[in-house]
Amino acid sequence: MPTITSYFGFLLAASTITTALFIGLSKIRLI
């Protein structure tokens, strides 16, 4: 169970970072 939880947390963190980077690039391109 802890392994699945940690994997889910890692997946969530990775998706959050990817989204943040994508939004940052979009803002830079808009500017």
UniProtKB/Swiss-Prot annotation:
Write out the similarity annotation. Answer: Belongs to the PetL family.
Which gene underlies this protein? petL
Q: What is its main location?
A: plastid
Q: Name one GO cellular component term.
A: chloroplast thylakoid membrane
Any one Gene Ontology MF annotation carried by this entry is: electron transporter, transferring electrons within cytochrome b6/f complex of photosystem II activity
Instruction: Give the UniProt keywords, A-Z.
Output: Chloroplast, Electron transport, Membrane, Photosynthesis, Plastid, Thylakoid, Transmembrane, Transmembrane helix, Transport
Q: What is this protein called?
A: Cytochrome b6-f complex subunit 6
What Pfam families does this protein's entry cite? PetL
Localization terms from the record: Plastid, Chloroplast thylakoid membrane
Lineage, top-rank taxon, reads: Eukaryota
The protein's job, in short, is: Component of the cytochrome b6-f complex, which mediates electron transfer between photosystem II (PSII) and photosystem I (PSI), cyclic electron flow around PSI, and state transitions. PetL is important for photoautotrophic growth as well as for electron transfer efficiency and stability of the cytochrome b6-f complex.
Q: Which organism is it from?
A: Acorus calamus (Sweet flag)
Q: Name one GO biological process term.
A: photosynthesis
- Transmembrane stretches, start-end: 4-26
Q: What topology in the membrane does the UniProt record assign?
A: Single-pass membrane protein
Subunit details for this protein? The 4 large subunits of the cytochrome b6-f complex are cytochrome b6, subunit IV (17 kDa polypeptide, PetD), cytochrome f and the Rieske protein, while the 4 small subunits are PetG, PetL, PetM and PetN. The complex functions as a dimer.
